[in-house]
Amino acid sequence: MNKFERHTKAIDYALSKIKESPLSKFVKEVVLFGSVARNEERYDSDIDLLLVLDEQARAYKRDILNLRGNISSDELADAEADLKITFNENWRDSMDTIFLCIKKDGIKIA
């Protein structure tokens, strides 16, 4: 499996886990960022995802923790996924370094 297939498979898996989650009704957007979004990934790179949820999802802490823990496939050949979660779309106004990078390089995938 080449790096493109590896990362595509990991993204598809993560998106399926998000859609299966009780949080799916609160999803505002999913943004791919990091080396994969910049086309600078290596074979061993992980995928970085920002999950933007509606404020109401804050009440679903257990589901949030469960999703974070299950966002990557158990298959050793698959890339790992790193999931960042934020609420509402105020992240776009943030001056935090991570959000500045996401605004610059991020690709909305859902």
Predicted regions mapped to residue ranges:
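Short, conserved active-site loops that position catalytic residues or coordinate cofactors/metal ions
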Residues: 45-47
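Short beta-strand->loop micro-motif that forms the acidic, two-metal-ion catalytic signature
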Residues: 49-51
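Catalytic core of pol beta-like nucleotidyltransferases
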Residues: 1-29, 37-43, 54-110
